[in-house]
Amino acid sequence: MKIHQIHDFDLNDESDFIRTQQSLIHKINLSPVIHPDSVNTCAGVDLAYWEQDGEPYGVCSIIVIDADTKEVIEKVHSMGKISVPYVSGFLAFRELPLIIEAAEKLEAEPDVFLFDGNGYLHYNHMGVATHAAFFLGKPTIGIAKTYLKIKGCDFEMPENEVGAYTDILIDGEVYGRALRTRRDVKPIFLSCGHNIDLESSYQITMKMINRDSRLPIPVRLADLETHVLRTFYRKNHV
């Protein structure tokens, strides 16, 4: 898959991160470039981390499925040492090198990418799902398992029905949705990434839900795969 190299990762402090984010924020597109009914393939993206000899390592898994049959079409991964320092609010900078490396291995070009993480629902609207979209050139959706509290704003719990949701409003702006994908199970937190609107994100996500998990199928598969890969690499000290 072709990757758009919009910036490098020779970034070492918060001022570098802020400058890079600010150069992209005004380019975020919250209008859909594809209709949910036209989505044929969906990719799930997740990462897992561990320490080895005092050094941080990570693995990224991308799993592509057929949107209709839900069968796996392709899966790729990348593994390596994490070189970008962690700074709160700028996690994407640590994750993107591995995401890009894995995506470059894809033979398929998924119609949409679903990330285990936030997109527009972020302090600067630049969660990993949004930031990664500029490299991938595809619509992206953020799927977070836990709520990122911004400016002290809580979310309203959706009704206990599959598909129920409440919009997350912060200073009068919709950042995302708290979405119930299974009864009697905690909601997930949905947000646009880039080149997609919230309603399309919702429709695509709900089409990817089954009875096995509250997470969309490709995200759940990527999550499971990263745990398997992390165990393998930790055990074999690769």
From Swiss-Prot:
Residues annotated as binding Mg(2+) are 46, 116
Listed Pfam families: Endonuclease_5 (PF04493)
Any Gene Ontology CC annotation: cytoplasm
GO terms, biological process:
DNA repair
Q: What does this protein do?
A: DNA repair enzyme involved in the repair of deaminated bases. Selectively cleaves double-stranded DNA at the second phosphodiester bond 3' to a deoxyinosine leaving behind the intact lesion on the nicked DNA.
Q: Which CDD domains match?
A: Endonuclease_V
Cofactor(s) listed: Mg(2+)
This chain's source organism reads Bacillus velezensis (strain DSM 23117 / BGSC 10A6 / LMG 26770 / FZB42) (Bacillus amyloliquefaciens subsp. plantarum)
Site annotation Interaction with target DNA: residues: 86
The protein in question is named: Endonuclease V
Presence of the UniProt keyword Cell division in the record = no
Q: Which gene encodes it?
A: nfi
Reaction(s) the record says it catalyses: Endonucleolytic cleavage at apurinic or apyrimidinic sites to products with a 5'-phosphate
**Keyword terms of this UniProt record:** Cytoplasm, DNA damage, DNA repair, Endonuclease, Hydrolase, Magnesium, Metal-binding, Nuclease
Query: Which HAMAP family does this entry report, sorted A to Z?
Result: Endonuclease_5
| UniProt-listed Gene3D superfamilies | archaeoglobus fulgidus dsm 4304 superfamily
Protein's cellular compartments? Cytoplasm
* Gene Ontology molecular function, alphabetical: deoxyribonuclease V activity; magnesium ion binding; RNA endonuclease activity, producing 5'-phosphomonoesters; single-stranded RNA binding
Q: What class of enzyme is it?
A: hydrolase
Record EC number? 3.1.21.7
Q: Which family does it belong to?
A: Belongs to the endonuclease V family.
Matches recorded under PANTHER family: ENDONUCLEASE V
